[in-house]
Amino acid sequence: MGKISSLPTQLFKCCFCDFLKVKMHIMSPSHLFYLGLCLLTFTSSATAGPETLCGAELVDALQFVCGDRGFYFNKPTGYGSSSRRAPQTGIVDECCFRSCDLRRLEMYCAPLKPAKSARSVRAQRHTDMPKAQKEVHLKNASRGSAGNKNYRM
């Protein structure tokens, strides 16, 4: 049974090889060169690891990854296992001179800032109004009460 199931496979391989031979004779050497160059490019880019980022490309990548949080060029304190490391490495050392990945870039993002709680307008009026009313009352009182005149400000 093994020979019967492999017969269609062998026929396909043979026909495919014949098809390629005919196509190769039709293609010019320059076309073959460009086809080979494309194949090399696609295979090498598929196996390539993280790339290096320097200068404006590094800044653009950090802005994209970190967004509104911002980023640091040196690691903030608290990263790493020991604070006694003599040479402090930065993002340029890690991503420009060597290749780095997305996780490495995210390590240099600033932490999220907690949202500021806005004071309500009602709370501002409550705290500001008595002081203003008190000042007006004091000004009226300082003018005296001669003639029982009411002064308005």
UniProtKB/Swiss-Prot annotation:
Location within or outside the cell: Secreted
One GO MF term: insulin-like growth factor receptor binding
Region (A): 90-110
A GO CC term attached to the entry: alphav-beta3 integrin-IGF-1-IGF1R complex
Propeptide residue interval(s): 119-153
Keyword Signal (UniProt): yes
Organism placement in taxonomy: Eukaryota, Metazoa, Chordata, Craniata, Vertebrata
The entry's keywords: Disulfide bond, Growth factor, Secreted, Signal
Protein name: Insulin-like growth factor 1
UniProt region (C), positions on chain: 78-89
Ranges of compositional bias, category Basic and acidic residues: 125-138
Organism: Panthera tigris altaica
